[in-house]
Amino acid sequence: YMTLLDVLQQEGPGSLKVLDAVRSLGLSSPEVTAFPVTKIDGTSYEITTVAGVPRIGYRPPNAGAKNLNTRHTNKTVKCYYIDGPIEVDKAIVTSSKNGAKLLAKETKNVTAGAFASVALQTWYRLKEDEDVFPCVSEQMGDYMTISADPSKREDTEANRADNSGASAYLVILGDDFLHYVWGKQMTLSLSPVKEERVSRKTKNEEEGSITAYTSRLEGWNGIAVESPYAVARIKNITPEHPLTDELVAEAKTLFPSAMRGMISYVVMNGIVKLGLQKTRRITPGTGNGATSMIATDPDSVQNIKILEVDSLLNDESEESVRAAFAEDYFKAYRSSLALKN
């Protein structure tokens, strides 16, 4: 399959500028660059998933066979417009020998913000927000979720709604499974830089304007979960109930046996990955008794590669998700273990 990085190399000059920014900043949102990309002509398309295949039986001679057809479920996948205006005051650009670099740096920053926005939207959505695509947990199949907390394993309404703690996702990537969708036969593109007047408040907070160099980063974006077996989720991960090899092994059993070898990644954030690492104790053969130590930084679990991302939250309660979307700016990454200087 093609990833966003593959596609950007084939598109026009505006996309190549995005590619330059992605190469320096995209690792903060690796799911956006690692997941497959499907480009479509418009901004939506219909997909048909198989809800059940007929059980073909045997019959004696001269007896009729039951007429059964495959059961299908239809749904529409939509792309939504992502729009990142870029503007730098001409006075700043022309007064500095590094003015051109300032414009390039702002372009990279806006690109990083766009990728972080797509990444956050991949995993979360506010229920009332109709201007963005449904997130992965809304689209994934029923009965593809387990809890890391043994007290929340029973299939009840309360346990289904409980999103406290963090999550890790097992994903199968591909056009028939989990992939991003980009509309209008384009991904993200930068419009040519131009000089124009833009509105800006004066120092006295009155209406005014400045001359600025402007551009736009724009595209039509969505995500599709085309198979009920494309994604499995392990939720309610906390320090008391960390991610373990055993939990991932259990989550693998949610997939049909023929598909378990197709799982592309276990997607998790750094704190969840650290918790997994701490559960893996090793005992060196020192000859001085059993002295255990923490295992090395894991790159796989149950023979599935780990994709570490910053976009998955440590607490996925509604309050925490709302707080993440309430911010106008993505702050520099900060571990939840860190102390302020």
Residue ranges, per PLM feature:
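Core alpha/beta structural scaffold of self-assembling particle/tube/pore-forming proteins
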Residues: 3-32, 45, 72-80, 85-341
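N-terminal low-complexity, intrinsically disordered segments
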Residues: 41-72
